Amino acid sequence: MKNHIKFLKRLKCIVPKHIKPKFHNDEELLAWNQEQGRLSSEAILRKNKAMKMQRILGRSGIRELYMNCSFENYHIEHEGHKKVVIASKEYAHNFNKNMASFIFSGKPGTGKNHLASAIGNYLILNGKSVLIVTVADLMSNIKSTFNGNNNVTEERLLNNLSNVDLLMIDEIGMQIESRYEKVIINQIVDRRSSSKRSTGMLSNLDYRGLKILLGERVIDRMRLGNSLWLTFNWDSYRKKIHGNEF
C-alpha cells in the first residue's frame, strides 16, 4: 500500500492540470483499494456457493431444467399464479418453525414443479437436505433392493428417504395403481410424520383422486400442522412457449 501512495504522489507531479485524477488523496486510494478487495471476496464467495449448490443439486434429484427455478422467476399472469407463489414462498420461509407438508395438485405444465423446485433450492441454500423423486424412480429403487447383490436393503433405503429434511414425491397418480406402491408411500409418509419431517407431493389428481389412490390415512398425515394444499387449476403454460423460450 505504501508503494501505491508513493506512486500517487509522483503521479500528481507529472499529470497535466487539465486531467482530473480519480483519487485526490491517500484516503480515497485506500478506500478504493479496500472496496475492490471486498468486491473480489464477494465474487469468490458467490462462485464457491454456486459450485456447492450445483454439487448438492446433483444429489437432490432436482432436474437440470428446474435448477434455476426461484419464486422470483415464476411467470405471474393472474391472481391464481400470485396466490401460489406467495403461499410457496411463505412455506419455504417458515420451514424451520414447524412440521408442515404440502401437496401441489393440478394439470401438467401449470408450475407445480417450478415452485416445488424453488422451495427445494431455497432450503438447500439455507443448509437443509432436500430430495425430489418421482414415484417411478422411487419404486424402481425399492425393487432394486430385492436383488441379492445389492448392498442397499429396502429398510435402509426407506430410512434414507425418511431422514432428509424435505422429501418431495413427484408424479403421484401417473403410475398404474398398485397395492405395493400405496404401501410404500404410506410407510414413507408415516415414518416422516412420526419423526416430524415434512413431505411434499406433486400430482395431476384432485383431492378426491388422491384420497382414493393413497387412502384417507396418508392424506390425513399430509395435512398435519400448518400444511399446504395448492390447486393449480389453470391451463398449461407450456402451450404458450415457442422455440427456445423453454
UniProtKB/Swiss-Prot annotation:
GO terms for biological process: DNA replication, synthesis of primer. SUPFAM superfamilies: P-loop containing nucleoside triphosphate hydrolases (SSF52540). It is an enzyme of class 3 (hydrolase). Disulfide bonds: none annotated. The helix loader is a DnaB(6):DnaC(6) complex with a crack opening large enough to allow ssDNA into the central cavity. Belongs to the DnaC family. PANTHER family: ATP-BINDING PROTEIN RV3427C IN INSERTION SEQUENCE-RELATED, CHROMOSOMAL REPLICATION INITIATOR PROTEIN DNAA. This is Replicative helicase loader DnaC.
